[in-house]
């Protein structure tokens, strides 16, 4: 996540190097790499003069928090599937999206999962295991999903509100989720693996402001 940290530093120069600015908040989808970059930024800038806030939350709330100035920045992703809808919403909210990087889709699961030894996983391989997705509340449109392939008809789906619960479900039920593959072992631990999905789609991860 070196590139993410570098981007945070650029944002730090813009938002924090102003004497009258005493608060800095970031809202984000459930990305451990973004939390890690935020932690590094807070340590390097120092927490004596600034009040930091990080909100790991639902997609619509990320957008609303930036729109309503609760957060200076929001971290989320665009794909071929959701880009048209979300960019329309960004325009309505008078916010803009800046891409940080692109990545393929990975299957994230427990290292003792029956599929953990595979070099590549297919959607057919995953049919007998529960797909874990983040709950989006009343805005439960496929376009707000934090996971790729949100319209695919999985046999079993479990929704969760936070990363800790999702990690527990991976261990307890051999669940999986689809992600960017950029994982922070410092935060999630080293008991999990990210394996390429054969039917991968491109994720455009960036920030809104």
Where are these regions (language model features)?
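Alpha-helical "hinge/linker" immediately C-terminal to small N-terminal DNA-binding modules
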Residues: 1-17
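Short, well-ordered beta-strand segments
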Residues: 23-29, 74, 108, 132, ...
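Secondary-structure junction motif
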Residues: 34-37, 83, 123, 127-152
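Short beta-strand-centered segments that line the small-molecule binding cleft or hinge
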Residues: 39-41, 60-105, 109, 192-194
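A late-sequence structural motif
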Residues: 111, 193-209
């Amino acid at each position: 996540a070196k590139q993410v940290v570098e981007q945070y530093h650029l944002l730090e120069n813009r938002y924090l190097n102003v004497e009258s600015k005493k608060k800095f908040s970031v809202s984000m989808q459930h990305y451990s790499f973004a939390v890690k970059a935020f932690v590094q930024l807070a340590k390097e800038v120092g927490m004596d003069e600034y009040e930091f806030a990080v909100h790991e939350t639902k997609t619509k709330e990320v957008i609303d928090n930036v729109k309503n100035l609760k957060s200076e920045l929001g971290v989320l992703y665009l794909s071929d599937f959701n880009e048209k809808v979300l960019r329309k919403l960004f325009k309505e909210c008078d916010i803009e999206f800046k891409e940080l990087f692109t990545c393929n889709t990975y299957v994230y699961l427990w290292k003792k999962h029956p599929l953990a030894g595979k070099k590549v996983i297919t959607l057919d391989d995953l049919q007998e295991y529960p797909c874990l997705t983040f709950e989006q509340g009343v805005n439960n449109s496929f376009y707000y999903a934090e996971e790729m392939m949100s319209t695919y008809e999985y046999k079993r789906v479990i929704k969760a509100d936070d990363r800790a619960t999702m990690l527990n479900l991976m261990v307890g039920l051999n669940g999986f989720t689809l992600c960017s593959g950029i994982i922070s072992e410092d935060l999630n631990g080293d008991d999990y693996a990210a394996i390429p999905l054969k039917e991968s789609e491109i994720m455009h991860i960036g920030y809104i402001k």
